[in-house]
């Protein structure tokens, strides 16, 4: 092999030398053609001398046909062509004349040329069978190496498949563990609420009527004014410390206390907050679990008194704070009161009741509380406001031009104010809040939320003070509390068909889309129809806004195929889909009614004003559609069937 390498190197060196020599002697390209003009077609025709003609010319016997020519053929209105060829390519005699000149002028170069000829003959006279055998050996080695690599890759693929299966199993276990942790957290919170509610039976057993701080400040006693503020309570009146005598017929009964008389003093009453707790059935019987508590704070010694108001609250735990203006009330002078006392004997039982009271007027104090309603109404806007089927969608009205081509803007239909929330682009972690539409048009944002996990798509909604979105590149949906700024709920959609590849191009609509209508919160996502066509169809499901749970009885598989529509929205429990998003003249071409489980083709015109609509959401409070079209924010008024 060493000889072959050196031989090849020497041959390459000599070849390059000869090439350089030919350039020195003026041997250039055979034919060179140049053309000029805008409309030009050129053709060169070369007629060289033959070897016989060359020998005749050299011998002096030249004929008429012994000549060489280079003809130029051109065509076109604006054309200029020229063809040139070196004499060596047209006249073979030139090569012989060059050799003779080289012998005379440079004998060393002639020797070099002869050496090159010798090397070329040696190269072609070698045993090519040996080279062929070496090549076969190399090919067999390459085949063996390829088979070995395939075997190793197969093993590695099997190992990777097993690893992926193990990881998926671990993920399923982790999901189960996360559900268990959520249930444990709920149980712990329930236990905490029960511990808070346990004070009511204990206070009842101790006969303190929920008065806090009475042991520390014995002079602050509950008077008739306090009892008027808590008329609906079922707890017994508190016992004071000073005893008094009582008359009995058959035996002596322990005396009942009478509060000390006090002079009227003006005291401000400030209701700091109202807290609602969930009531159990047994605790309802004890009149303690469903109470609303208010703390009354007086100016003297900071004594706190607890007012318990009976109520039947069966909803989930609702904790609300309420502000109230402080009022002045006169502390009444307590009057002696003899509480009912029962005397017993062997034959008769006599009950003596003596009550002396003085009417005292107090200023009216109003507690303005707002209760969200029963559990069945937590996911509803207002059932009575549902208009029914769409008759038409009016022309869009442009509100503002803001942000990038893709995005979403929305309002909370439950909120009383007109705050606007914007997500610019279809991937990110920022939610921008504007106080109203005027501030949005001026670009004056009032709040900026950075969610802990990135959102993707434009199918987000804001509902009941929370931001609902799809976590990027996952099947998870998240509820982000805007007031507390933390993730309040997290759920995995098991049957969703999700493309986990990086979608750096807008595909027409979001994979997971939220919607809000008169009945509450919905989620729209693609799933595989394993029962019939094995195709990917759109599924709509009612969501519990508290924990994002999904029930089978409120989940419907529609006949709408994935990637066959532009955008969709839900009104009054009916899913509507627009056929295109990137054409101005669109149409609502599909509707699915969850009440009757039927589908139809409404064929209602829908205008994509700027031919790139990335979001359409319905606002049940305003009865309009919010849309983001190529960086423009639009609203559509919806007309319903009368």
From Swiss-Prot:
Q: Which SMART domains match?
A: OLF (SM00284)
Q: What is its main location?
A: secreted
Residue ranges of the Olfactomedin-like domain? 385-642
Q: Where is the composition biased (Basic and acidic residues)?
A: 221-249
What's an example GO cellular component term for this entry?
extracellular region
Q: Which InterPro entries match?
A: Olfac-like_dom, Olfactomedin-like_domain
Disulfide bridge positions per record: 386-572
Subunit description: Homodimer.
Q: What is this protein called?
A: Olfactomedin-like protein 2A
């Amino acid at each position: 092999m060493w000889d072959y390498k050196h031989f090849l190197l020497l041959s390459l060196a000599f070849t390059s030398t000869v090439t350089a020599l030919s350039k020195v002697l003026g041997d250039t390209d055979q034919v060179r053609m140049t053309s000029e003009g805008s409309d030009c077609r050129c053709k060169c025709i070369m007629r060289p001398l033959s070897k016989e003609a060359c020998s005749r010319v050299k011998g002096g016997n030249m004929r008429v046909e012994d000549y060489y020519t280079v003809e130029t053929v051109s065509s076109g209105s604006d054309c200029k062509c020229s063809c040139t060829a070196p004499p060596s390519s047209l006249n073979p005699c030139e090569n012989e004349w060059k050799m003779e000149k080289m012998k005379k002028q440079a004998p060393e170069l002639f020797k070099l040329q002869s050496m090159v000829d010798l090397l070329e003959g040696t190269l072609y006279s070698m045993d090519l069978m040996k080279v062929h055998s070496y090549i076969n050996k190399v090919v067999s080695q390459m085949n063996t190496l390829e088979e070995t690599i395939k075997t190793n890759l197969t093993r590695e693929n099997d190992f990777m498949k097993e690893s992926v299966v193990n990881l998926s199993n671990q993920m399923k276990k982790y999901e189960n563990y996360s559900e268990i942790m959520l249930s444990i957290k709920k149980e712990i919170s329930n236990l905490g609420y029960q511990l808070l509610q346990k004070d009511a039976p204990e206070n009842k057993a101790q006969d303190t009527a929920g008065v806090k701080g009475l042991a520390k400040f014995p002079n602050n006693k509950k008077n008739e004014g306090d009892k008027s503020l808590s008329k609906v309570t079922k707890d017994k009146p508190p016992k004071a410390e000073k005893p008094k005598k009582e008359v009995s017929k058959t035996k002596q009964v322990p005396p009942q206390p009478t509060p000390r008389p006090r002079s009227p003093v003006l005291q401000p009453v400030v209701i700091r907050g109202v807290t609602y707790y969930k009531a159990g059935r047994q605790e309802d019987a004890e009149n303690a679990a469903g109470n609303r508590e208010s703390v009354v704070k007086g100016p003297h010694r900071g004594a706190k008194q607890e007012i318990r108001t009976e109520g039947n609250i069966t909803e989930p735990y609702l904790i609300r704070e309420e502000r109230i203006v402080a009022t002045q009330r006169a502390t009444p002078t307590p009057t002696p009161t003899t509480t009912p006392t029962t005397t017993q004997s062997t034959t008769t039982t006599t009950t003596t009741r003596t009550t002396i009271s003085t009417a005292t007027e107090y200023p009216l104090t109003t507690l303005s509380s707002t209760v969200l309603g029963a559990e069945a109404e937590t996911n509803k806007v207002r059932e009575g406001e549902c208009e029914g089927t769409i008759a038409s969608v009016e022309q869009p009205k442009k509100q503002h031009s803001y942000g990038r081509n893709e995005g979403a803007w929305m309002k909370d239909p439950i909120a009383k104010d007109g705050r606007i929330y914007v997500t610019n682009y279809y991937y990110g972690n920022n939610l921008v809040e504007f106080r109203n539409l005027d501030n949005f048009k001026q670009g004056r944002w009032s709040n900026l939320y950075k969610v802990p996990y990135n959102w993707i798509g434009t199918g987000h909604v804001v509902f009941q003070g929370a931001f609902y979105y799809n976590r990027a590149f996952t099947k998870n949906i998240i509820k982000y509390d805007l007031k507390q700024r933390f993730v309040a709920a997290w759920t995995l959609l098991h049957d969703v068909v999700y493309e986990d590849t990086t979608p750096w191009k807008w595909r027409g609509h979001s994979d997971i889309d939220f919607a809000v209508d008169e009945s509450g919160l919905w989620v729209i996502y693609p799933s595989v129809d394993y029962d019939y066509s094995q195709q990917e169809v759109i599924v709509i499901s009612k969501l519990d806004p508290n924990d994002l749970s999904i029930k089978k009885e409120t989940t419907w598989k529609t006949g709408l195929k994935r990637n066959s529509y532009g955008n969709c929205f839900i009104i009054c429990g009916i899913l509507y889909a627009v056929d295109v998003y990137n054409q101005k003249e669109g149409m609502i071409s599909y509707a699915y009614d969850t009440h009757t489980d039927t589908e139809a083709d409404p064929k209602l015109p829908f205008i994509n004003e700027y031919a790139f609509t990335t979001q359409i959401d319905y606002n049940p409070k305003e009865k309009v559609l919010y849309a983001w079209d190529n960086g423009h924010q639009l609203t559509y008024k919806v007309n319903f069937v009368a």
